[in-house]
């Protein structure tokens, strides 16, 4: 049993990139689907596909690598808010990720979005993870 599904999601992506895998399969949930959509919109992954099976479904993610250096597009995935220590932030108090080069994924009352989107909509929330 996984006690922190978001940490498991990030770890599966991190481990697949360290092993230079092109594809990673992750058990699906609505929150993970939204995080995957954000990663695709921001250009951190090549493509993704949701597959339904008899249980909860799968998310298949095609990871993105630099063509010349073969380095992954995602340099770091770190969990910020965790079950034992939740981290919340107001819209004007979001910390910049990698001096503005990365993104933070935030769960707000208006849905899951990046820190920049939350700041523009003037809504705070739980900071799930930082990606750069």
Locate the predicted segments by residue.
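Core subunits and conserved enzymes of cellular information-processing
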Residues: 1-132
């Amino acid at each position: 049993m996984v006690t922190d599904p978001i940490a498991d999601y990030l770890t599966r992506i991190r481990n697949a990139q360290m092993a230079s895998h092109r594809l990673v399969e992750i058990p699906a949930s609505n929150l993970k689907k939204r995080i995957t959509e954000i990663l695709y919109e921001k250009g951190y992954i090549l493509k993704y596909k949701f597959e339904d099976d008899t249980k909860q479904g799968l998310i298949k993610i095609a990871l993105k690598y630099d063509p010349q250096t073969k380095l992954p597009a995602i340099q770091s995935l770190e969990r910020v808010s965790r079950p034992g220590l939740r981290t919340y932030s107001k819209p004007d108090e979001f910390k910049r990720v990698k001096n503005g080069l990365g993104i933070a994924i935030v769960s707000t009352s208006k849905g899951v979005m990046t820190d920049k989107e939350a700041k523009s909509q003037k809504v705070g929330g739980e900071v799930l993870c930082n990606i750069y």
